[in-house]
Amino acid sequence: MRTRANRANKIAVSLKPVIFCDFDGTITQLDVTDEILAQLAHPSWREVEQEWACGSIGSRECLERQMALVEASAAELNGLIDAVPIDPHFSRFLRLVDVRRLPFYVLSDGFDYVIRRVLKRAGINGYLQNGTHLFASALRVEGRRLLTSFPHSASPCAHGCATCKAEIMRRLSAGRHPMVFIGDGLSDRFAVQEADVVFAKRQLLTYCREKGVTCYPFETFAEVETALKELLPFERLQKKGEDSINQRSRVKS
């Protein structure tokens, strides 16, 4: 496992890290999939969850079996999704990412239908809605059944993931860019093995501490934004460049 010093060195030599972010419980303040299951699924979903938690099955099989236990109309599902709060600091963090032109991707075992609806309600559109920067499981509603598919589950995936975050990270960074990962759950544990800088909370933070994975604890995206500004020299370099341009403009005027 790479040390914090090695990670910091890799970040320091690059002006364009790639940022990868989980969705459920990270961008949102609670796990939307768990809420759907808790409110709309047969109680036996918890037994399937336990199989996944102890490592007997991967997240793809887990979600496939669990969502088959859900019975709900589109209206019921949408009503639940629309009540999910997101991190109040996420929009500001995303503006920083956009201004600095940092590649940003959402990687989730959760479902595209849910993610797009939550982000749209929060006024977040553009590239996170169009599919090029969103990698998630697929969901569609037919009657009172929820049908799933897994377009980003690598074949073969040694861990049986619904979305193979590690493989996507390797492919998108192409070995040329340092990788930042932001997450909160056990489904993120394989992604942190690829990342150069990790921001973790809840179960992922516990996992990182138990496994000796260097990480930065956080509760909100305000903390992630502050830490990134301190870690990444591009922030200071960019600011100096802007100040220099502004100064030249004042002299000319």
Regions found by a protein language model. Name each.
Residues 2-123, 133-138:
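Alpha-helical substrate-recognition element adjacent to the catalytic core
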